[in-house]
Amino acid sequence: MTKQPDEWLDDVPDNDEEDEEIIWVSKSEIKRDAEELKRLGAELMELGSNSLDRIPLDEDLRSAIELAQKIKKEGRRRQMQLIGKMLRSRDEEPIRTALDKLKNRHNQQVALFHKLEMMRDRLVEQGDEAVAEVLALYPNADRQQLRAMIRNAQKEKAGNKPPKAYRQIFQYLRELAEA
């Protein structure tokens, strides 16, 4: 006995439950993700122990990274692959977030130093106008000390002497910024 086309549907089980969504991932995408995790592992290998302390790593991963930092040549590559494999089985987001914070803090510090250098240059070139701006930014700054350092820096610049006072101004501004 042959079934009619409309009877074929009777053999299909009713699936009233929600169908599980199957997400198809290409092999190339899996490889790209694995390569990205290896790069993350390489970035972690470049960090010092103080920086690694600030990143949430479990003991196995931490010891694998420390071992990779000691290994040279071909063994290092294999260890990097192991670190990538270990990262695939862990949640990478907290690690990436902590790593980005470390990088961002360094960038912020560099930007602050550039700002302080420009402020120092303005102090030496413009004198009292720039001193007023510095005092507005940092009310706890000592006007007399700052003006004395500026005068010394201007004398050194005019006499082609080493910029000792110039560096002192920068150090003073840095102390004010960190306070």
Curated annotation (Swiss-Prot):
CDD domains: YjgA-like
Gene3D superfamilies: PSPTO4464-like domains
One of the Pfam families matching this protein, by short name: DarP
Leader sequence residues: none
Entry's Gene Ontology cellular component terms: cytosol
Gene Ontology biological-process entries: assembly of large subunit precursor of preribosome
Keyword match Plastid: no
Annotated keywords: Cytoplasm, Ribosome biogenesis, RNA-binding, rRNA-binding
Entry's Gene Ontology molecular function annotations: ribosome binding; rRNA binding
Compartment(s) where it occurs, according to its Swiss-Prot or TrEMBL record: Cytoplasm
Coiled coil: none
Free-text function comment from the UniProt entry: Member of a network of 50S ribosomal subunit biogenesis factors which assembles along the 30S-50S interface, preventing incorrect 23S rRNA structures from forming. Promotes peptidyl transferase center (PTC) maturation.
Family: Belongs to the DarP family.
HAMAP family: DarP (MF_00765)
The protein, known as: Dual-action ribosomal maturation protein DarP
Organism, scientific name: Erwinia tasmaniensis (strain DSM 17950 / CFBP 7177 / CIP 109463 / NCPPB 4357 / Et1/99)
Gene: darP
